[in-house]
């Protein structure tokens, strides 16, 4: 079995708070029976993840997103679930060499984003793309969500590769000029739990007040209590029960929100090119 590599906690105490899961834990998180007890993440605040700028009335920041601090929060999330923080997550040079990438246009490896919208606490994600093979057309991805944090609402359309290296098989150098079908995907919750949002299904957002209350103001007007850009009004709670959930309709709008302890979710899909993503919030960036 390969040794799991973990990084020492380097973020400030303000960045991410923990509460211990058991009262008999030692300083190293070990309980009286010798087993390591996971720690529980708490909800984050935008003020801890931006430099400069100010927060508006909705808590959205005009400052510069601190990617390093955001990554550290996800590493802490991983440790809270006893999920390994691999060397490839922390050593970019190693990751690029081992995955035979000449650049990061089609980025394999770990990343953290606020979608360039200043609302990381409610509108952000961490992710790693394990594989994305155009020749054989398959894709593997893990999604990391902090407590009550949402992925940007999005859909997938068919298209053609835009970047030259997206068309190139990384292992053989072969150029694969082919149309890309709309991405179809399924998800398996590994740790924590999520609220799943979809435009397919009966609108039932009011039955999930916690999820509704934590939607970003980019999507929902909380004072008027109505959606602005939000299209996905059917909500389900998915738990780590060994059941995979499939996107109900090709091209449909969807996203996830992490539960109260955050979540780690594995995604299975056909080949994916980010140029084929569409977002309800304008000018989303990575």
What are these regions (language model features)?
Residues 146-147, 160-207, 213:
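Glycine- and acidic-residue-biased ligand/ion/polar-headgroup-sensing regions
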Residues 151-153, 194-198, 267:
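Short hydrophobic/aromatic-rich beta-strand segments that constitute the beta-sheet cores
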Residues 201-234, 253-286:
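Double-stranded beta-helix
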């Amino acid at each position: 079995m390969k040794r799991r590599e973990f990084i020492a906690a380097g973020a400030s105490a303000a960045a991410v708070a923990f509460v211990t899961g058991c009262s008999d834990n030692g300083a190293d998180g070990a309980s009286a029976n010798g087993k390591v007890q996971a720690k529980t993440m708490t909800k984050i605040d935008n003020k801890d993840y931006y430099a400069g700028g100010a927060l508006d009335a909705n808590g959205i920041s005009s400052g510069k997103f601190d990617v390093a601090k955001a990554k550290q929060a996800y590493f802490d999330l991983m440790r809270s679930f006893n999920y390994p923080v691999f060397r490839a997550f922390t050593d970019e040079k190693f990751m690029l060499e081992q995955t035979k990438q000449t650049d990061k246009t089609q980025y394999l490896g770990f990343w953290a984003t606020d979608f360039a919208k200043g609302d990381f606490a409610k509108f952000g994600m961490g992710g790693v793309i394990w594989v994305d093979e155009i020749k054989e057309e398959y894709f593997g991805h893990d999604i990391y969500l902090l407590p009550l944090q949402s992925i940007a609402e999005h859909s997938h359309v068919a298209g053609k590769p835009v970047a030259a290296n997206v068309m190139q098989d990384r292992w053989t150098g072969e150029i694969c000029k082919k149309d890309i079908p709309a991405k179809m995907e399924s998800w398996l919750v590994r740790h924590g739990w999520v609220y799943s949002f979809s435009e397919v299904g009966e609108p039932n957002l009011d039955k999930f007040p916690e999820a509704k209350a934590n939607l970003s103001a980019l999507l929902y007007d909380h004072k008027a209590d109505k959606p602005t850009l939000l299209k996905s009004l059917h909500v389900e709670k998915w738990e780590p029960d060994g059941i995979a959930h499939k996107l109900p309709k090709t091209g449909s709008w969807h996203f996830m929100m992490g539960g109260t302890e955050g979540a780690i979710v594995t995604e299975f899909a056909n080949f994916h090119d980010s140029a084929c993503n569409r977002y309800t919030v304008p000018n989303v960036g990575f």
